[in-house]
From Swiss-Prot:
Record note on quaternary structure: Homotetramer.
Binding note for cofactor: Binds 2 Zn(2+) ions per subunit.
SUPFAM superfamilies on file: Composite domain of metallo-dependent hydrolases, Metallo-dependent hydrolases
Similarity remark: Belongs to the metallo-dependent hydrolases superfamily. Allantoinase family.
CDD domains: L-HYD_ALN
Protein name in UniProt: Allantoinase
A Pfam family assignment: Amidohydro_1
Cofactor: Zn(2+)
Organism: Escherichia coli O17:K52:H18 (strain UMN026 / ExPEC)
GO molecular function: allantoinase activity; cobalt ion binding; zinc ion binding
N6-carboxylysine, modified sites: 146
Protein backbone atom coordinates (compact mmCIF):
# COMPACT_ATOMS: atom_id res chain seq x y z
CA UNK A 1 0.00 0.00 0.00
CA UNK A 2 1.14 3.53 -0.74
CA UNK A 3 0.57 6.11 1.99
CA UNK A 4 0.22 9.87 2.02
CA UNK A 5 2.85 10.31 4.73
CA UNK A 6 5.34 8.24 6.70
CA UNK A 7 7.02 9.65 9.81
CA UNK A 8 10.29 7.79 10.41
CA UNK A 9 12.79 7.36 13.23
CA UNK A 10 11.02 9.34 15.95
CA UNK A 11 10.53 8.19 19.54
CA UNK A 12 6.77 7.70 19.39
CA UNK A 13 4.54 7.98 22.46
CA UNK A 14 2.15 5.05 22.27
CA UNK A 15 -0.47 4.28 24.89
CA UNK A 16 1.68 2.07 27.11
CA UNK A 17 5.19 2.55 25.80
CA UNK A 18 7.45 4.88 23.85
CA UNK A 19 9.75 3.49 21.17
CA UNK A 20 11.42 4.34 17.89
CA UNK A 21 8.89 3.29 15.28
CA UNK A 22 7.45 4.57 11.99
CA UNK A 23 3.92 5.90 11.48
CA UNK A 24 2.00 5.76 8.19
CA UNK A 25 -0.84 8.15 7.40
CA UNK A 26 -3.53 7.88 4.74
CA UNK A 27 -6.59 10.07 4.30
CA UNK A 28 -5.87 12.00 7.48
CA UNK A 29 -5.89 8.84 9.61
CA UNK A 30 -3.16 6.72 11.16
CA UNK A 31 -2.98 3.72 8.84
CA UNK A 32 -0.11 1.69 10.28
CA UNK A 33 2.60 1.70 12.95
CA UNK A 34 5.76 -0.39 12.60
CA UNK A 35 8.91 -0.78 10.54
CA UNK A 36 9.40 -0.95 6.78
CA UNK A 37 5.87 0.29 6.11
CA UNK A 38 6.33 0.85 2.39
CA UNK A 39 6.12 3.91 0.16
CA UNK A 40 4.58 7.32 0.75
CA UNK A 41 4.12 10.57 -1.12
CA UNK A 42 5.99 12.30 1.69
CA UNK A 43 8.48 11.02 4.25
CA UNK A 44 9.40 12.99 7.38
CA UNK A 45 12.50 12.16 9.37
CA UNK A 46 11.86 12.62 13.11
CA UNK A 47 15.27 11.39 14.26
CA UNK A 48 16.12 12.75 17.70
CA UNK A 49 12.56 13.97 18.25
CA UNK A 50 9.72 12.80 20.45
CA UNK A 51 6.49 12.27 18.50
CA UNK A 52 3.54 12.80 20.82
CA UNK A 53 -0.20 12.72 20.24
CA UNK A 54 -1.34 16.27 19.58
CA UNK A 55 -2.43 17.85 22.85
CA UNK A 56 -6.14 17.84 23.67
CA UNK A 57 -6.58 21.03 25.69
CA UNK A 58 -9.81 20.51 27.59
CA UNK A 59 -10.05 24.05 28.98
CA UNK A 60 -9.66 26.96 26.55
CA UNK A 61 -11.38 30.35 26.45
CA UNK A 62 -11.75 31.92 22.99
CA UNK A 63 -13.73 35.11 23.48
CA UNK A 64 -15.25 35.31 20.01
CA UNK A 65 -17.90 36.51 19.25
CA UNK A 66 -18.52 39.59 21.34
CA UNK A 67 -15.10 39.93 22.97
CA UNK A 68 -12.75 39.07 20.13
CA UNK A 69 -10.55 41.97 21.31
CA UNK A 70 -9.68 39.67 24.23
CA UNK A 71 -8.81 36.62 22.09
CA UNK A 72 -10.15 35.43 18.75
CA UNK A 73 -10.26 32.16 16.85
CA UNK A 74 -7.54 33.15 14.39
CA UNK A 75 -4.92 34.17 16.95
CA UNK A 76 -5.92 31.71 19.65
CA UNK A 77 -5.83 28.63 17.45
CA UNK A 78 -2.55 29.66 15.79
CA UNK A 79 -1.02 29.94 19.25
CA UNK A 80 -2.45 26.54 20.09
CA UNK A 81 -0.92 24.96 16.99
CA UNK A 82 2.44 26.55 17.73
CA UNK A 83 2.23 25.02 21.18
CA UNK A 84 1.43 21.49 19.98
CA UNK A 85 -2.32 21.55 20.61
CA UNK A 86 -4.38 19.91 17.87
CA UNK A 87 -7.77 19.88 19.62
CA UNK A 88 -9.25 22.32 22.10
CA UNK A 89 -12.41 22.03 24.14
CA UNK A 90 -13.81 25.51 24.32
CA UNK A 91 -15.38 27.00 27.43
CA UNK A 92 -18.84 28.61 27.19
CA UNK A 93 -17.84 31.91 28.79
CA UNK A 94 -15.91 35.13 28.10
CA UNK A 95 -17.61 35.46 24.70
CA UNK A 96 -20.87 37.39 24.33
CA UNK A 97 -23.41 35.99 24.35
CA UNK A 98 -22.35 33.17 26.64
CA UNK A 99 -22.87 29.72 25.10
CA UNK A 100 -26.08 28.80 26.90
CA UNK A 101 -28.54 27.79 24.14
CA UNK A 102 -28.82 26.80 20.49
CA UNK A 103 -28.77 30.37 19.18
CA UNK A 104 -25.59 31.33 21.03
CA UNK A 105 -23.60 28.28 19.96
CA UNK A 106 -24.61 28.84 16.34
CA UNK A 107 -23.10 32.33 16.65
CA UNK A 108 -19.81 30.73 17.68
CA UNK A 109 -19.87 28.36 14.73
CA UNK A 110 -20.42 31.33 12.41
CA UNK A 111 -17.69 33.41 14.07
CA UNK A 112 -15.11 30.64 13.62
CA UNK A 113 -15.61 30.03 9.89
CA UNK A 114 -12.28 29.99 8.08
CA UNK A 115 -10.32 30.78 11.26
CA UNK A 116 -9.70 27.43 13.01
CA UNK A 117 -6.12 26.26 12.72
CA UNK A 118 -6.92 23.31 15.03
CA UNK A 119 -10.01 21.22 15.74
CA UNK A 120 -12.45 22.33 18.44
CA UNK A 121 -15.14 20.76 20.58
CA UNK A 122 -17.61 22.84 22.55
CA UNK A 123 -18.93 22.98 26.10
CA UNK A 124 -22.31 24.39 26.90
CA UNK A 125 -22.97 26.51 29.95
CA UNK A 126 -25.06 25.61 32.99
CA UNK A 127 -26.13 29.00 34.33
CA UNK A 128 -28.85 30.39 36.54
CA UNK A 129 -31.11 31.24 33.58
CA UNK A 130 -30.93 28.29 31.16
CA UNK A 131 -31.81 25.12 33.08
CA UNK A 132 -34.87 24.59 30.87
CA UNK A 133 -32.74 24.85 27.70
CA UNK A 134 -29.86 22.48 28.41
CA UNK A 135 -31.27 19.96 25.95
CA UNK A 136 -30.74 22.43 23.09
CA UNK A 137 -26.97 22.35 23.53
CA UNK A 138 -26.95 18.58 23.94
CA UNK A 139 -28.82 18.25 20.65
CA UNK A 140 -26.30 20.49 18.89
CA UNK A 141 -23.44 18.29 20.08
CA UNK A 142 -21.56 19.79 23.03
CA UNK A 143 -19.32 17.36 24.94
CA UNK A 144 -20.09 18.66 28.44
CA UNK A 145 -21.49 21.54 30.48
CA UNK A 146 -19.49 24.05 32.53
CA UNK A 147 -20.72 25.88 35.61
CA UNK A 148 -19.35 28.04 38.40
CA UNK A 149 -20.12 27.80 42.09
CA UNK A 150 -17.72 30.75 42.46
CA UNK A 151 -18.96 34.20 41.49
CA UNK A 152 -18.56 34.98 37.79
CA UNK A 153 -19.98 37.16 35.03
CA UNK A 154 -20.66 40.86 34.58
CA UNK A 155 -24.00 41.58 36.23
CA UNK A 156 -24.37 44.63 34.01
CA UNK A 157 -24.51 42.50 30.84
CA UNK A 158 -27.69 40.48 30.35
CA UNK A 159 -26.20 37.69 28.23
CA UNK A 160 -22.96 37.18 30.15
CA UNK A 161 -22.19 33.97 32.03
CA UNK A 162 -23.60 33.49 35.55
CA UNK A 163 -22.72 31.28 38.48
CA UNK A 164 -25.26 28.87 39.98
CA UNK A 165 -26.46 28.41 43.53
CA UNK A 166 -26.75 24.96 45.09
CA UNK A 167 -30.36 24.46 43.98
CA UNK A 168 -29.61 25.47 40.39
CA UNK A 169 -26.55 23.22 40.34
CA UNK A 170 -28.53 20.27 41.67
CA UNK A 171 -31.42 20.71 39.21
CA UNK A 172 -29.01 21.19 36.32
CA UNK A 173 -26.99 18.13 37.32
CA UNK A 174 -30.16 16.03 37.42
CA UNK A 175 -31.01 17.05 33.85
CA UNK A 176 -27.46 16.51 32.63
CA UNK A 177 -27.40 13.09 34.23
CA UNK A 178 -30.50 12.21 32.24
CA UNK A 179 -28.81 13.46 29.08
CA UNK A 180 -25.63 11.49 29.80
CA UNK A 181 -23.57 14.67 29.89
CA UNK A 182 -20.81 15.52 32.38
CA UNK A 183 -20.90 18.70 34.43
CA UNK A 184 -17.62 20.60 34.81
CA UNK A 185 -17.30 22.85 37.84
CA UNK A 186 -15.16 25.80 38.89
CA UNK A 187 -14.95 25.05 42.60
CA UNK A 188 -14.47 27.92 45.04
CA UNK A 189 -16.87 29.01 47.78
CA UNK A 190 -18.46 32.15 46.33
CA UNK A 191 -19.63 33.85 49.53
CA UNK A 192 -16.41 33.35 51.46
CA UNK A 193 -14.05 34.29 48.60
CA UNK A 194 -16.10 37.39 47.79
CA UNK A 195 -16.18 38.52 51.42
CA UNK A 196 -12.48 37.91 51.99
CA UNK A 197 -11.64 39.78 48.80
CA UNK A 198 -13.75 42.80 49.72
CA UNK A 199 -12.29 42.82 53.21
CA UNK A 200 -8.74 42.80 51.84
CA UNK A 201 -9.44 45.61 49.37
CA UNK A 202 -11.11 47.76 52.03
CA UNK A 203 -8.02 47.42 54.19
CA UNK A 204 -5.59 48.18 51.35
CA UNK A 205 -4.20 44.64 51.16
CA UNK A 206 -3.64 44.28 47.41
CA UNK A 207 -0.47 42.21 46.91
CA UNK A 208 -0.23 38.76 45.34
CA UNK A 209 0.07 37.24 48.80
CA UNK A 210 -3.09 39.09 49.84
CA UNK A 211 -4.97 37.80 46.81
CA UNK A 212 -3.93 34.21 47.52
CA UNK A 213 -4.96 34.64 51.16
CA UNK A 214 -8.39 35.83 50.03
CA UNK A 215 -9.01 32.52 48.22
CA UNK A 216 -7.62 29.97 50.71
CA UNK A 217 -7.37 26.25 50.08
CA UNK A 218 -10.38 25.45 52.25
CA UNK A 219 -12.67 27.46 49.93
CA UNK A 220 -11.69 25.16 47.06
CA UNK A 221 -11.92 21.99 49.14
CA UNK A 222 -15.34 22.87 50.56
CA UNK A 223 -16.75 23.57 47.10
CA UNK A 224 -15.33 20.33 45.69
CA UNK A 225 -16.78 18.35 48.58
CA UNK A 226 -20.18 20.00 48.11
CA UNK A 227 -20.50 19.46 44.36
CA UNK A 228 -19.24 15.88 44.69
CA UNK A 229 -22.10 15.07 47.00
CA UNK A 230 -24.74 16.95 45.00
CA UNK A 231 -23.62 15.38 41.71
CA UNK A 232 -23.67 11.94 43.32
CA UNK A 233 -27.25 12.41 44.52
CA UNK A 234 -28.25 13.91 41.14
CA UNK A 235 -26.75 10.98 39.22
CA UNK A 236 -24.45 13.11 37.09
CA UNK A 237 -20.87 12.51 35.97
CA UNK A 238 -18.59 15.21 37.38
CA UNK A 239 -15.35 16.85 36.25
CA UNK A 240 -13.53 19.24 38.59
CA UNK A 241 -11.77 22.05 36.74
CA UNK A 242 -8.28 23.48 37.41
CA UNK A 243 -7.64 21.98 40.85
CA UNK A 244 -4.96 24.04 42.58
CA UNK A 245 -4.38 22.20 45.87
CA UNK A 246 -3.41 18.65 46.88
CA UNK A 247 -6.22 18.75 49.45
CA UNK A 248 -8.69 19.33 46.62
CA UNK A 249 -7.27 16.40 44.67
CA UNK A 250 -7.66 14.21 47.76
CA UNK A 251 -11.41 14.86 47.79
CA UNK A 252 -11.66 13.60 44.20
CA UNK A 253 -9.52 10.55 44.95
CA UNK A 254 -11.65 9.66 47.96
CA UNK A 255 -14.86 9.95 45.93
CA UNK A 256 -13.40 7.77 43.17
CA UNK A 257 -12.41 5.13 45.68
CA UNK A 258 -16.03 5.11 46.85
CA UNK A 259 -17.19 4.46 43.29
CA UNK A 260 -18.22 7.94 42.12
CA UNK A 261 -17.78 8.80 38.43
CA UNK A 262 -15.54 11.87 38.76
CA UNK A 263 -12.45 13.18 36.99
CA UNK A 264 -10.26 16.23 37.47
CA UNK A 265 -7.78 18.48 35.72
CA UNK A 266 -5.05 20.91 36.68
CA UNK A 267 -2.90 23.45 34.84
CA UNK A 268 0.83 23.96 34.24
CA UNK A 269 0.90 27.20 36.21
CA UNK A 270 0.08 25.37 39.43
CA UNK A 271 3.20 23.22 38.91
CA UNK A 272 5.77 25.74 37.66
CA UNK A 273 4.83 29.01 39.40
CA UNK A 274 4.43 29.82 43.10
CA UNK A 275 3.23 32.81 45.12
CA UNK A 276 6.69 34.39 45.30
CA UNK A 277 6.96 34.29 41.51
CA UNK A 278 3.38 35.56 41.24
CA UNK A 279 4.44 38.57 43.32
CA UNK A 280 7.37 39.20 40.94
CA UNK A 281 5.43 38.67 37.71
CA UNK A 282 2.40 40.66 38.84
CA UNK A 283 -1.09 40.67 37.39
CA UNK A 284 -0.20 38.51 34.35
CA UNK A 285 -0.05 35.56 36.77
CA UNK A 286 -3.38 36.27 38.45
CA UNK A 287 -5.96 33.51 38.07
CA UNK A 288 -8.52 31.69 40.17
CA UNK A 289 -8.04 29.47 41.97
CA UNK A 290 -4.79 31.32 42.69
CA UNK A 291 -1.18 30.24 42.33
CA UNK A 292 -0.24 29.03 45.79
CA UNK A 293 2.99 28.59 47.75
CA UNK A 294 5.91 26.29 47.04
CA UNK A 295 4.82 23.68 49.58
CA UNK A 296 1.44 23.47 47.85
CA UNK A 297 3.21 23.09 44.50
CA UNK A 298 5.29 20.19 45.81
CA UNK A 299 2.09 18.47 46.90
CA UNK A 300 0.58 18.96 43.46
CA UNK A 301 3.57 17.30 41.81
CA UNK A 302 3.12 14.33 44.13
CA UNK A 303 -0.55 14.03 43.19
CA UNK A 304 0.29 14.30 39.48
CA UNK A 305 2.90 11.53 39.61
CA UNK A 306 0.55 9.37 41.69
CA UNK A 307 -1.96 9.43 38.83
CA UNK A 308 -4.61 11.28 40.85
CA UNK A 309 -4.95 14.11 38.30
CA UNK A 310 -6.46 12.99 34.99
CA UNK A 311 -5.33 15.68 32.58
CA UNK A 312 -3.41 18.91 32.21
CA UNK A 313 -5.10 21.88 30.54
CA UNK A 314 -4.19 25.48 29.79
CA UNK A 315 -7.20 27.36 31.18
CA UNK A 316 -6.14 29.95 28.61
CA UNK A 317 -8.16 33.02 29.63
CA UNK A 318 -6.59 36.21 28.28
CA UNK A 319 -7.86 39.78 28.24
CA UNK A 320 -6.77 43.17 26.90
CA UNK A 321 -3.66 44.54 28.67
CA UNK A 322 -5.59 47.42 30.23
CA UNK A 323 -7.63 44.90 32.21
CA UNK A 324 -4.38 43.70 33.81
CA UNK A 325 -3.41 47.23 34.87
CA UNK A 326 -3.46 48.38 38.48
CA UNK A 327 -3.18 46.28 41.60
CA UNK A 328 -3.60 42.53 41.76
CA UNK A 329 -6.88 42.59 43.67
CA UNK A 330 -8.55 44.72 40.98
CA UNK A 331 -7.03 43.18 37.82
CA UNK A 332 -8.74 40.58 35.63
CA UNK A 333 -8.02 37.03 36.70
CA UNK A 334 -6.87 34.85 33.83
CA UNK A 335 -3.62 33.53 32.38
CA UNK A 336 -2.55 33.42 28.73
CA UNK A 337 -0.96 30.00 28.55
CA UNK A 338 -2.07 27.63 25.80
CA UNK A 339 1.02 28.17 23.63
CA UNK A 340 3.35 26.86 26.34
CA UNK A 341 1.58 23.91 27.94
CA UNK A 342 3.44 21.15 26.15
CA UNK A 343 6.97 22.53 26.06
CA UNK A 344 6.90 23.77 29.67
CA UNK A 345 5.45 20.52 31.03
CA UNK A 346 7.73 18.31 28.91
CA UNK A 347 10.68 20.20 30.35
CA UNK A 348 9.43 20.26 33.95
CA UNK A 349 7.75 16.84 34.16
CA UNK A 350 9.71 14.62 31.77
CA UNK A 351 13.17 16.16 31.65
CA UNK A 352 13.54 17.54 35.17
CA UNK A 353 11.43 15.06 37.17
CA UNK A 354 11.58 11.85 35.16
CA UNK A 355 7.95 11.38 34.13
CA UNK A 356 7.56 8.56 31.62
CA UNK A 357 6.59 9.47 28.07
CA UNK A 358 3.42 7.34 28.14
CA UNK A 359 2.25 9.15 31.29
CA UNK A 360 2.99 12.49 29.64
CA UNK A 361 0.92 11.45 26.62
CA UNK A 362 -2.00 10.45 28.80
CA UNK A 363 -1.95 13.71 30.77
CA UNK A 364 -1.68 15.92 27.69
CA UNK A 365 -3.94 14.07 25.25
CA UNK A 366 -5.33 10.59 25.87
CA UNK A 367 -7.22 11.08 29.12
CA UNK A 368 -8.94 14.30 28.03
CA UNK A 369 -10.04 12.66 24.78
CA UNK A 370 -11.49 9.74 26.74
CA UNK A 371 -13.23 11.88 29.37
CA UNK A 372 -15.02 13.96 26.74
CA UNK A 373 -15.72 11.23 24.21
CA UNK A 374 -13.39 12.46 21.45
CA UNK A 375 -13.01 9.02 19.95
CA UNK A 376 -10.75 10.00 17.06
CA UNK A 377 -8.33 12.01 19.19
CA UNK A 378 -5.67 11.62 21.84
CA UNK A 379 -3.82 8.46 20.75
CA UNK A 380 -1.24 7.38 18.24
CA UNK A 381 -3.00 4.21 17.13
CA UNK A 382 -4.34 2.84 13.82
CA UNK A 383 -7.66 4.38 12.84
CA UNK A 384 -7.24 7.55 14.90
CA UNK A 385 -6.83 11.04 13.46
CA UNK A 386 -3.24 11.67 12.42
CA UNK A 387 -2.63 14.41 14.99
CA UNK A 388 0.98 14.69 16.13
CA UNK A 389 3.41 17.08 17.73
CA UNK A 390 7.18 16.84 17.31
CA UNK A 391 9.09 17.78 20.46
CA UNK A 392 12.81 18.51 20.42
CA UNK A 393 14.10 17.54 23.87
CA UNK A 394 17.00 19.26 25.64
CA UNK A 395 16.70 22.30 23.39
CA UNK A 396 16.53 25.45 25.49
CA UNK A 397 15.14 28.80 24.47
CA UNK A 398 14.00 31.93 26.28
CA UNK A 399 10.37 32.82 25.54
CA UNK A 400 9.89 36.38 24.26
CA UNK A 401 6.78 38.43 23.61
CA UNK A 402 7.48 38.22 19.88
CA UNK A 403 7.25 34.41 20.05
CA UNK A 404 3.58 34.60 21.05
CA UNK A 405 0.70 34.29 18.59
CA UNK A 406 -1.98 35.57 20.99
CA UNK A 407 -4.11 38.62 20.23
CA UNK A 408 -2.12 40.32 23.01
CA UNK A 409 1.50 39.19 23.18
CA UNK A 410 1.78 38.80 26.93
CA UNK A 411 2.24 35.76 29.16
CA UNK A 412 3.56 35.00 32.64
CA UNK A 413 6.06 32.68 30.93
CA UNK A 414 7.81 35.47 28.97
CA UNK A 415 11.46 35.51 30.05
CA UNK A 416 11.37 31.88 31.13
CA UNK A 417 14.03 29.49 29.86
CA UNK A 418 12.18 26.45 28.50
CA UNK A 419 14.23 23.31 27.94
CA UNK A 420 12.26 21.76 25.06
CA UNK A 421 10.79 23.02 21.78
CA UNK A 422 7.77 22.25 19.65
CA UNK A 423 9.14 21.91 16.13
CA UNK A 424 6.11 20.66 14.18
CA UNK A 425 2.38 20.17 14.70
CA UNK A 426 0.32 17.94 12.40
CA UNK A 427 -3.48 17.89 12.20
CA UNK A 428 -5.15 15.02 10.34
CA UNK A 429 -1.97 14.41 8.36
CA UNK A 430 -1.21 18.02 7.38
CA UNK A 431 1.49 20.21 8.91
CA UNK A 432 -0.27 23.16 10.53
CA UNK A 433 2.81 24.57 12.27
CA UNK A 434 6.52 24.21 11.54
CA UNK A 435 9.27 25.95 13.47
CA UNK A 436 10.97 26.99 10.22
CA UNK A 437 7.97 27.56 7.92
CA UNK A 438 5.47 28.95 10.41
CA UNK A 439 1.89 28.13 9.36
CA UNK A 440 2.18 26.57 5.89
CA UNK A 441 -1.49 25.81 5.15
CA UNK A 442 -4.75 27.73 5.37
CA UNK A 443 -6.81 27.06 8.53
CA UNK A 444 -8.29 23.56 8.26
CA UNK A 445 -9.71 23.04 11.73
CA UNK A 446 -13.20 21.64 12.25
CA UNK A 447 -15.75 21.61 15.03
CA UNK A 448 -16.14 18.22 16.69
CA UNK A 449 -19.72 17.41 17.70
CA UNK A 450 -20.69 14.71 20.17
CA UNK A 451 -23.14 12.90 17.91
CA UNK A 452 -20.56 12.68 15.10
CA UNK A 453 -18.13 10.65 17.22
Amino acid sequence: MSFDLIIKNGTVILENEARVVDIAVKGGKIAAIGQDLGDAKEVMDASGLVVSPGMVDAHTHISEPGRSHWEGYETGTRAAAKGGITTMIEMPLNQLPATVDRASIELKFDAAKGKLTIDAAQLGGLVSYNIDRLHELDEVGVVGFKCFVATCGDRGIDNDFRDVNDWQFFKGAQKLGELGQPVLVHCENALICDALGEEAKSEGRVTAHDYVASRPVFTEVEAIRRVLYLAKVAGCRLHICHISSPEGVEEVTRARQEGQDVTCESCPHYFVLDTEQFEEIGTLAKCSPPIRDLENQKGMWEKLFNGEIDCLVSDHSPCPPEMKAGNIMEAWGGIAGLQNCMDVMFDEAVQKRGMSLPMFGKLMATNAADIFGLQQKGRIAPGKDADFVFIQPNSSYVLTNDDLEYRHKVSPYVGRTIGARITKTILRGDVIYDIEQGFPVAPKGQFILKHQQ
